[in-house]
Amino acid sequence: LKTEMGVISSDGIVGIIDNTTKRYSSIMSILNIEMKINAKVKRTEHFGTLEWDGFDTRHLTLNDISETAKIKVGDSIITGGMSLIFPEGINIGTVSKIISQNETYSDSKARTIKISVRDDSIIDLDIRENYLKIEVKLHNDMSNLNNVYIIESLNKKEFQKLKK
């Protein structure tokens, strides 16, 4: 086993191996606020970033999906395949709630950032406007896992050569 290998159960993703020794490995769970998973809505194929907010162990949040996407409660969420850790199509969960990001930020200052560019002009960017906050109910019961499986990326070395 090696670091950065994906860990799944028969119901969905569990985490990523973060440390190994000769006999043991530890896993960073998807229930870690620093974990970000590339995921997509299976029906519409819209990509986003799946994160845990640190509260409810049954739900994750899918961010960065445009408000124009026709997402529905009950839609399946799967891995997006844009990483070498998890291939595309592994089950994660289902959409349980959809919230407009505009509803989550009532103070416009919380949404606006200023960026300075080369010519010393300043651009205001609204970082969350027009995006959905999607609550995803996990297929896995993360408090009751028995058997897990490890995913080894067979193309990882070849991909890393391209990056050099």
Give residue ranges: language-model regions:
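Extracytoplasmic/periplasmic terminal helices and flexible tails
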Residues: 1-164
